[in-house]
Design a protein with these regions (language model features):
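Juxta-kinase regulatory segment immediately upstream of eukaryotic protein kinase catalytic domains
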Residues: 1-42, 241-264
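ATP-binding glycine-rich loop module of kinase domains
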Residues: 42-95
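Short beta-strand micro-motifs within the conserved protein kinase catalytic domain, predominantly
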Residues: 115-125
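Conserved catalytic cores of large enzyme domains
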Residues: 4-11, 63-79, 123, 263
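C-lobe/activation-segment region of protein kinase-like
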Residues: 188-264
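Conserved kinase catalytic-core helix
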Residues: 96-113, 136-174, 179
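A glycine-centered beta->alpha junction motif in the catalytic cores
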Residues: 60, 75-85, 129-144, 188-191
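Catalytic activation segment of kinase domains across protein kinase-like and atypical kinase folds
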Residues: 122, 131-132, 137, 167-209, ...
Length: 265
């Protein structure tokens, strides 16, 4: 087994079969059609079941990788002049339960998110079951004009999260899904209540970083200012360099800082 496969915690088929059997029994199905997603995902094995449920299988290795990511992100937060606000989960089941609850809370405050079904454990694996959204596109798969049109809605949804005391913690273009011109958030991570305000600024920095390569710095800042204040964006500036060193973000931090500085004066 190659190292990347081992570290990512990919689940062998016999173990997946046990999980599929559990799903079949829980939902009263004689047969289930399972389709695995070709996703570059270090934190779970994702699959679509009967085109009805989106299922994440989370292994102990996935939990270990999450712990490593959490440590790295907290070190990055320290480098931005604030205490770390990311939190780790103790077990694969806790990872699944957190995402289930985060998805439920987003829906409760009126945001679009897949309908949460349940989280449970099978042989030490955490299993998360959500509604499957069959006709979605991730934000970065749209044409530029449509991305510009939807950008204000992305920032408004993020503002709504923060107004209700929630934080996403891992906002990237692939975690923003578009279904019939509606914006859906997925894959929220775990942040501490004590670091709420810093985590909101970090979220906003991530949103700016996700949008800038798609529509440019000026259009990104204009879209953000439809729901956020210049002071909000100035607070986010402190996290842009930290976000910029993440391998899953690639954007022009200097351009964003320049436009934010112009708008804030």
């Amino acid at each position: 087994m190659e190292l990347r496969r081992l570290v990512r915690g990919r689940v062998d088929w016999p173990r997946l079969e046990a999980i599929v059997r559990e799903l079949r029994e829980r939902y009263g199905r004689e047969e289930l059609h399972v389709r695995f997603l070709e996703a570059d995902n270090w934190l779970s094995t994702p699959m679509v079941v009967d085109d009805e449920w989106f299922v994440k299988v989370i292994s102990k290795q996935n939990s270990l990788v999450h712990a490593l990511f959490t440590t790295g992100r907290n070190l990055g937060a320290f480098s931005s002049g604030t205490e770390g606000f990311f939190e780790h989960f103790g077990t694969p089941l806790e990872m699944a339960e957190h995402e289930l609850e985060a998805t439920r809370r987003m829906r409760e405050i009126g945001l679009n998110a897949p309908e949460p079904v349940e989280a449970f454990e099978v042989d030490g694996f955490g299993v998360l079951v959500l509604e499957y959204l069959p006709h979605f596109q991730s934000l970065d798969r749209l044409d530029r004009e449509r991305e510009k049109q939807l950008a204000p809605a992305v920032f408004e949804a993020l503002y709504t999260m923060h107004e209700h005391g929630l934080a996403h913690g891992d906002l990237r273009a692939e975690n923003v899904l578009i279904v019939d011109d509606d914006v859906y958030f997925i894959d929220a991570t775990n942040v501490s209540d004590e670091g709420a305000e810093d985590s909101w600024s970090y979220d906003l920095a991530c949103a700016l970083a996700a949008m800038e390569p798609l529509i440019g710095a000026k259009a990104t800042v204009d879209a953000a200012l439809e729901s956020h204040t210049p002071e909000d964006l100035l607070a986010a500036i402190y996290f842009l360099d930290f976000v910029n060193i993440r391998p899953d973000h690639d954007f022009d931090a200097a351009a964003l800082k320049g436009v934010i500085g112009q708008r804030a004066t």
